[in-house]
Amino acid sequence: MPAPFDYIDIGQVVGLGMARIETAVLETFIAAFTPGWTADRGAPDAMVYAIWARLDAVASTDWPQTKRLGVDALRWVRNPPVGETLRGRMTVMAKDPVGEGKGIVIAQHDLLDEEGRLVFSCLTRSLFSR
């Protein structure tokens, strides 16, 4: 789990948890948010993003992260099928102090499938307290 800004190391890798693609959840998501998509194509991109966002939100609840400044460089590599378990991880790429009480942490976030293949990736910029 990340620490205050000054104790976060570049290259540090943090697990964000796991989530399984469940049939009922996939069907409900498709009906609500991606009309025209079919479940046989796997989880739609929007659902993959939502899974990452949930894993990130739960994992970072107790972090000294005070604000998410941006999410960019989003990449979807594949649409995981029903039954697939995805694993989230965050890798600290860079950090920059901005004043006495805070600093910006730039991190790459990945969702990997059960075989360790990349499913989704993005970069984040977050403010952490020092």
Task: Map each language-model feature to its residues.
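HotDog/MaoC-like acyl-thioester-processing domains
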Residues: 1-9, 80-130
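Mid-chain, well-packed structural core segment of small domains
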Residues: 62-91
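Hot-dog-fold acyl-thioester-processing enzymes
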Residues: 1-70
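Generic structural detector for well-ordered beta-strands
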Residues: 15-20, 75, 125-127
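Short helix-to-loop capping/linker segments positioned immediately adjacent to catalytic or ligand/cofactor-binding
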Residues: 37-41, 76, 96-98
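Short, surface-exposed, charged/polar-biased interaction segments
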Residues: 32-37, 73, 111, 130
